[in-house]
Curated annotation (Swiss-Prot):
Subunit structure: Binds to the N-terminal domain of the chaperone ClpA.
Entry protein name: ATP-dependent Clp protease adapter protein ClpS
The protein's role, per its UniProt record: Involved in the modulation of the specificity of the ClpAP-mediated ATP-dependent protein degradation.
Gene name of the encoded protein: clpS
Organism field: Aliivibrio salmonicida (strain LFI1238)
Domain of life of the native organism: Bacteria
Coiled coil feature spans: none
GO BP term, example: protein catabolic process
NCBIfam families in UniProt: PRK00033.1-3, PRK00033.1-5
Family under the similarity heading: Belongs to the ClpS family.
Amino acid sequence: MSKFYEWISPDSDVLELEKTGLKPPPMYKVVLNNDDYTPMEFVVEVLDKFFSMDLEKATQLMLTVHYEGKAVCGVFTAEVAETKVAQVNIYSRDNEHPLLCTMEQA
């Protein structure tokens, strides 16, 4: 087996694996903001449709939005967060509701 490695001389340049040091992507919170006009049922519908929440979790989060003014719907990479914010805002406008979804750095 030593014959297999004979072609590598001890003083030759040998490539070593370099650690790339990949960092995880920055994460963003998708936030639903309260308003005085959007029906609670519509907020629950949005949470179900765009964040795949079951009825109980969506209702709890809707109540948090209602009583605390805003709530985090989820934490995502920038591209996913931007997409969800746009989807919710477009869907809200299409249904003539002023519901506002925003994103904040986590």
